[in-house]
Structure formats: C-alpha cells, structure tokens
Amino acid sequence: MSTSSEPYLEPLRLFLNKECIWRKTGKGAKHREYRCLSSSSPWSILPHQAARRVWKYEINIIIVKKRNDDYIISMAIEGLHYQQILCPKVLTQLFFILHSHGGTKFYKLTFDPFKPMNAELAVPLYDTTPLPHMTMQGLSVYDHCSVVGKPICAQVAGSITQIGTCGVWAVTTGAQTNIVCFALRYDLAVCISDPKVFPSMARCMASAVGCAQETCSYCTGHNKHVEVFDVNGDYGKNKELCFCSTPCGDWDFRDESMKPLFSKNDDMVGIRVREPPNSENTIFSKASAYFYGITRDGKEVDLSDENFILLKIDPRLSHMIIVACPILKRMCMIKS
C-alpha cells in the first residue's frame, strides 16, 4: 500500500522503478544526477497523460543527499523542470555494462514511496547536453545468451507469454523476465547476417516472407521505439534488436536467398504456423514444433531444425529491450 499522499506520485514512482534504466551524468559531494530515455508507458504516470499521447520520456533526475532524513529528488521531463519530491530511501544498482562503448555503465534506481514537498527549493540546472548515440551490435547479443537444449515448462520457469507468432516468448520467474527466442546458430549468423541485426527467427522470417516495405509496422517494426542504450533522443524503429516484428501477408517467400536457412527442399514456397502444441505452458526447443514449410502443391515440408537454436537472453538485457518498446512493455510487464 502506498504512503504517498498525492495520487500521481505512486504511478510515477513505479514507472521510475520498473521502466527506467539510467546513466549517471553528474555527481558532487552531496548530489548525483542521472538521465534515462524510456518508451511510452502502458499506464498513466503524469496528471496530463490523458490529455495528449506521449511516445517517449527523456528524464533527468538530481538526487540531493538527505535533508531531515529524506532525499530531495528534482525531476525534469523532456528538459523542463517537472517537480521536486521527497524520498526516504533510494537504492542504486549497477545494472548493465556496455563494453563495446568503453564500459559505459547503466543503473537501476529503486525509490521508496515518494512524499510531496511543501515548498520547492530553487529549480536546479539540469545537464541536458546531448550524449553520443550508443548501440549493441546484433551479434554481440549472443554474448548475453545461453542455449536452451530442453523444453521450458511454466511450472518450473514461471509464467510464459508468447510474443507474436515467430518463436519469441517472455518467461517470467518472480521479478525476473528473460526473452526466449529461436535464432540462427552463431556460426551461420557470423557468415550471412548484417552484424548490426540480431538474427532471431522473427527477424529472419520478416526478411524472408515479409513484404519488405520499410513503412510496414509488422515486418520492420513500429516507429515508437526508443534506442535501447541511449538516454536522450527521439523515438523510431528498432528492427536491429527488438522482437516485436512479425511478417504480414501470406508468409510465402519473397526473398528466395533466405530459403536455405529454413529447409533443404527446393520446392518449398512458404512457411506456415502449426496448430499450437498441446501444452501452451511449455516452450519446445525445436523450431519444427511450431512451423513447417509448404510446397506449391500444398504438401508439408519439414523445416531444418539444425539452423536455428533456442536461446535465453540474459534478464538484464531482456529488460532493457523490453522497456525500449511500448508493445513489449504491454505484453511483458505487470502493473504492480
């Protein structure tokens, strides 16, 4: 039960705790400053939220060390001062290190229930200096994955949420969520894929049987993502790392060069989704449990299981991918 006396403070606190990953942008003897960029929240977090649609939040926070046993939290949204609030405790946790950019550190901040300030101090000067764009190469995602060689059962792993129809799931155990997906074997990915793109089966299918129109929000993803590792900037597409794309249309091959990845049968003209397995609470480790090929005369063709492996992505990277996408947020995150 929240002890916040203002009705909007608790939704805001939950948003900061669950949907924001921060970079430290400044520090002094008595303060720390952090910045984050998060996609649109599934829940209203600001009093004006119902009045207009907000697709991303760029937030600056200055945490001033204790005054009368409370921290003072100064907050700016989109570069404009929003308000100051009190918080009895703030936990700072090193969450992720992006080694490809000099070991840049990302933090998770956990705030105890907020309290309103009766009188604000002077508005601070927030650091809104643009920071360089950061990203992770798609092939580097493999460094944060483990291969799954046997079925994952909800009774053991926790709840399972299917994401789209292309072999992607969110597996939640307690407060931890892992993205589980089929992806190309690493040796194949190194040889044939764009190194910027993580070659999940969802991405490969979108390339193979999708419409190839850059404006298609199904095949190339919607344009409301924020960048996974940026803490400033605008929203746009993220077909390199996100898992929200799924092919539109009839799933017949439009890129014939992709066909050998899915089957050795030259007569295959498309991919189809099987009827759901008997156990929806189990993720099977073979792609052929979910998909099959089809020939021009309607005959079923087995897919080549050896080219795709089932991977479990590290929960911290999974979380960063989820909070960068409003669709994944709605599917994978539970309102507290």
Curated annotation (Swiss-Prot):
Location(s), subcellular: Virion tegument; Host cytoplasm; Host nucleus
Natural source organism: Elephantid herpesvirus 1 (isolate Asian elephant/Berlin/Kiba/1998) (EIHV-1)
Family: Belongs to the herpesviridae cytoplasmic envelopment protein 2 family.
UniProt name for this protein: Cytoplasmic envelopment protein 2
InterPro entries xref list: Herpes_UL16/UL94 (IPR004286)
Subunit note: Interacts with cytoplasmic envelopment protein 3 and with the capsid.
Disulfide bonds: none
Domain of life assignment: Viruses
Keywords: Host cytoplasm, Host nucleus, Late protein, Virion, Virion tegument
Function as written in the Swiss-Prot or TrEMBL entry: Plays a critical role in cytoplasmic virus egress. Participates in the final step of tegumentation and envelope acquisition within the host cytoplasm by directly interacting with the capsid. Upon virion binding to target cell, a signaling cascade is triggered to disrupt the interaction with the capsid, thereby preparing capsid uncoating.
A cellular-component GO term for this protein: host cell nucleus
